[in-house]
Swiss-Prot record:
Homotetramer; dimer of dimers. The active site is at 131 (proton donor/acceptor), 160 (schiff-base intermediate with substrate). One of its GO terms (cellular component) is cytoplasm. This is 4-hydroxy-tetrahydrodipicolinate synthase. PROSITE patterns: DHDPS_1, DHDPS_2. Gene3D superfamilies: Aldolase class I (3.20.20.70). Its main location: cytoplasm.
């Protein structure tokens, strides 16, 4: 995996998934040069999708993309059997890979993580990207575990690293050749400078062209040009997590007239003060005109 992979929102309309809006968003992203899309992840509100909706969203994304870019579907769960079922379904309908979040809440040991990811890797053939996000799962995939999984299973090829500790990123990249993608927009350039390959991005939902340019510059070693784009977009990056993701990005998309719609409870609309800050930031960077 290399480049920009937007973690796409799941647009809703009147309480149901807005598939027409989903197609519109995907076309916009592809037209602006992204490497692939990641449906039904954190940004896609996967915890509030029913299992049937989860599968149908993946199916529709594969259909809409139609081979133009990669589709890496979020199929993780804190139940190994459920993650396996989602992953096998995604493989059967033609995804290019799956993204597996660390099991959350039940907090397995590192040995449990090895067995969890290993069982899924042994049961599917498509590439697997691990997803490490300790702030949400209360559990870190340790560098030694990442190295073990990469070396033991040929289809574990990448990791979305949302642990902001760059020492961890350094340890991982120093120990094995797994593709590391930043899971935080604001850490994209530091991670690429250490040997990472790109980003699973939230902000790319609204600024794909700029983010693709930034990552392309960075991967080409042109960090001065990459930094210009980073600092231009930084006011928005900061606000993407002022409230729980995907509240800010869906709010921004609604402001920009993009298909996004409402949030599903327990997520709710953005506080008015934060909404005003977001509107001002979108104006400042020239996205809202």
């Amino acid at each position: 995996m290399q480049g920009v992979y937007p973690a796409i929102v799941t647009p809703f309309k009147d309480g149901k998934v807005d598939y027409d809006g989903l197609r519109t968003n995907i076309d916009f992203l592809i037209e602006n040069g992204i490497s692939g899309v990641i449906p039904v992840g954190t940004t896609g509100e996967s915890p509030t999708l029913t299992p049937l909706e989860h599968e149908k969203v993946i199916e529709n994304v594969v259909e809409f993309v139609d081979g133009r870019v990669e589709v890496i579907a979020g199929t993780g769960s804190n139940s190994t059997s459920e993650a396996l079922e989602f992953s096998q379904y995604a493989e059967d309908i033609g995804v290019d890979g799956v993204l597996l979040i660390t099991p959350y809440y039940n907090k397995p040991t590192q040995e449990g993580l090895k067995r969890h990811f290993g069982e899924i890797a042994n049961s599917i053939n498509v590439p697997i990207a691990l997803y490490n996000v300790p702030s949400r799962t209360a559990l870190n995939i340790e560098p030694e575990t990442i190295k073990y999984l990469f070396e033991e299973y040929s289809n574990i090829t990448a990791i979305k690293e949302a642990n902001p500790n760059l020492s961890q990123v350094s340890e991982v990249l120093d120990s094995c050749n797994i593709d590391v993608l930043s899971g935080n927009d604001e850490l994209t350039l530091p991670i690429i400078s250490l040997g990472g390959k790109g980003v699973v991005s939230v902000i790319a939902n609204i600024a794909p062209k700029e983010f693709v340019q930034m990552v392309d510059f960075a991967n080409a070693g042109k960090f001065d040009k990459a930094k210009e784009i980073h600092y231009k977009l930084f006011p928005i990056m900061k606000l993407m997590f002022v409230e729980t993701n995907p509240i800010p990005i869906k709010t921004a998309m609604n402001m920009l007239g993009m298909p996004s719609g409402e949030l599903r409870l327990p997520l709710c609309e953005m506080a008015e003060g934060n909404k005003l800050k977001l509107q001002n930031a979108l104006n400042t960077v020239g996205l809202l005109k």
